[in-house]
Regions:
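Bacterial Sec-dependent N-terminal signal peptides
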Residues: 1-42
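Beta-rich, blade/repeat-based domains predominating
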Residues: 57, 81-91, 130-143, 175-196, ...
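Short loop/turn segments immediately following beta-strands, especially the blade-tip
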Residues: 65-70, 112-119, 157-166, 215-227, ...
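A short beta-strand motif characteristic of beta-propeller blades
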Residues: 74-79, 122-127, 176-182, 232-238, ...
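Loop/turn-rich, solvent-exposed surfaces of beta-rich toroidal or solenoidal domains
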Residues: 293-325, 333, 337-345, 352-354
């Protein structure tokens, strides 16, 4: 499959300008934020961030205090960002990076300063992704990367010292198509993940049934002209035609990776070692042919895997992970609200929270540590069009 580099612009002049202008630029671009509560975190409390679609009443990104002992959420603040459908906090929790998912020139990556104690946001700046519909975003602390679904690309943004984003230094464009003429008419990048060892980046291409592999340059940052990503060997791993790779996750021990395929509704298990994937199993998560499988996560103890399905029989498929070989056994299915696009498990493993986009609610489920099964505790968090949940301990 042909792959081309659209641009490679190193932006020292832009960086200098950002340093000179500093907060004045940020204050000009900052949008309204509402402060609801000012208390800091206490024992068992997590800071929870929620990204939304803003076509309705939602304003953008919301912060909550979530108690992982009793499953209760308290609202803190919000910031107006358009269509922040995916977001990621920095490792220290001081910054949040979020996409603005649009199929036009509004497609962007946004940088925000975040006050963890108060739960408040301050927009630093936004940079165009150069690819439409950015739907996934990650950071290694030096760079931010977006997956641009309709743009058939991934974009790399160096991070300035103040946490803001410089213009894209690399935009990697992908070509090709798949057997599903309606959904795989071209490349569709849906997810990017850094491997547990921090050495590689994998990019899921729903349109071509591939996982692209890149070697990460840990030295690449604003101080040099080194590329963050270099094509790996092999350049990509191919999965069964028509699968539609969507999201990838890794086992806590780093030895296995699991891929949820949107179109086939299957989960593929891989052995992972030294940057290489070896397929070992394919198992159904969606048994009704909905072509809407979405998200995938593993419990903190590494014993259970969960995968969400949309469009028909909306819910979460539950699998036990064999401790010796990483193979999956399906053990249950939990029906949820409508369109469970995203979900997350608390760090202590007690709760699983589901962002049900079309039910306008985040559902809270208690997780049985022995069976992996879920029980709705009826502590719904009402919010318009929730599509991404992240925790900051």
């Amino acid at each position: 499959m042909k792959k081309t580099f659209l641009s490679k612009t190193f932006i020292f002049n832009s960086f200098a300008a950002v340093c000179i202008l500093g907060i004045s630029i940020s204050s000009c671009t900052s949008k309204k934020k509402t402060h609801m509560e000012t208390t800091g975190t206490t024992e068992n409390e997590l800071t929870m961030l929620v990204g939304t679609y803003t076509s309705g009443t939602s304003k953008g990104i919301y912060s909550f205090r979530f108690n992982e002992k009793d499953g209760i959420a308290v609202p803190l603040s919000e910031v107006e960002i358009e269509n922040p459908s995916y977001l990621v906090p920095s490792a220290d929790g001081k910054f949040v990076y979020a996409v603005s998912e649009f199929n036009d020139e509004r497609a962007a990556a946004n940088a925000l300063a975040f006050d963890k104690e108060k739960g408040t946001f301050q927009l630093l700046n936004s940079q165009k992704t150069g690819g439409e519909d950015p739907c996934y975003i990650i950071t290694n602390g030096k760079n931010v990367v977006t997956a641009n679904y309709s743009g058939s690309s991934i974009s790399v943004f160096p991070i300035a010292k103040d946490g803001s984003l410089l213009p894209a230094s690399d935009i990697l464009k992908f070509e090709g198509s798949g057997v599903d003429k309606e959904r795989q008419e071209k490349s569709h990048l849906h997810c990017i993940r850094i491997t547990p060892d921090g050495k590689y980046l994998f990019a899921d291409n729903l349109g071509t049934d591939q996982i692209h592999k890149y070697v990460i340059n840990p030295n690449a940052d604003i101080t040099n002209q080194e590329s963050f990503l270099k094509e790996g060997q092999p350049a990509a791993y191919k999965v069964k035609a028509g699968s539609g790779p969507r999201h990838l996750t890794f086992a806590p021990n780093g030895n296995y990776a699991y891929l949820i395929n949107e179109l086939s509704g299957t989960v593929i298990a891989f052995e992972y070692k030294d940057g290489n994937l070896k397929e070992i199993q394919t198992i159904a998560a969606d048994t009704v042919g909905a072509k809407g499988s979405a998200d995938i996560h593993i419990s903190p103890d590494g014993k259970f895997l969960y995968a969400s399905n949309r469009l028909k029989a909306d819910g979460i498929a539950i699998f036990r992970i064999h401790p010796d070989n990483g193979m999956l056994t399906k053990t249950g299915y939990q029906l949820t609200g409508i369109h469970p696009r995203n979900f997350i498990i608390t760090p202590n493993g007690k709760y699983l929270l589901v962002a049900c986009r079309d039910s306008n609610v985040i559902q809270v489920y208690e997780r049985d540590a022995d069976t992996g099964l879920l029980t709705d505790v009826h502590r719904d968090i009402k919010i318009d069009k929730p599509v991404c949940i992240r925790f900051i301990p």
